[in-house]
Amino acid sequence: MLERIKGCFTESIQTQIAAAEALPDAISRAALTLVQSLLNGNKILCCGNGASGANAQHFAATLINRFETERPSLPAIALNADSVVLTAIGNDRLHDEIYAKQVRALGHAGDVLLAISTRGNSRDIVKAVEAAVTRDMTIVALTGYDGGELAGLLGQQDVEIRIPSHHSTRIQEMHMLTVNCLCDLIDNTLFPHQAD
């Protein structure tokens, strides 16, 4: 059992090292995309399922409340947080539309959709991205594996942060670290004196 525990830590560390080599440019581009949207008076919509949904909610909560230092609230909505909306749409046999309907209702040109999907193939996330495209929104996608269907939907203005792993658990861990990096970069860019 002890060796298995050490193996989990070792695999996580190796994934972090690979990500630290592969992802800084994409994370920087994503942070700048998010910052520019916020500076323009827009908002961030976030979505994900399961652990990816927890990461989406963490991102939205951090923007609304704070990351590591006090600062003004920033507009973000986790589309997976409202169980009444989700079950109302799902009850009408439109499970694939649970996020897309919200994007069409709440999203505007200049907003950003933060879409988190470990494999990039979740139908409801794919449909949310398709809806965001019709609303002239920019997409920041956190993925893993080969990026899945989601990667193929992204345009030049969009950013994919693809974790270099084929293990869902490691990808989810790195998505959380990436979300924290994005929050740190947003705070340090928008509020440099408060972040010191």
UniProtKB/Swiss-Prot annotation:
The keyword Isomerase does not apply. Pfam families: SIS_2. Residues 34-196 form the SIS domain. One of its GO terms (biological process) is carbohydrate derivative metabolic process. HAMAP family: SIS_DiaA. Belongs to the SIS family. DiaA subfamily. Required for the timely initiation of chromosomal replication via direct interactions with the DnaA initiator protein. This is DnaA initiator-associating protein DiaA.
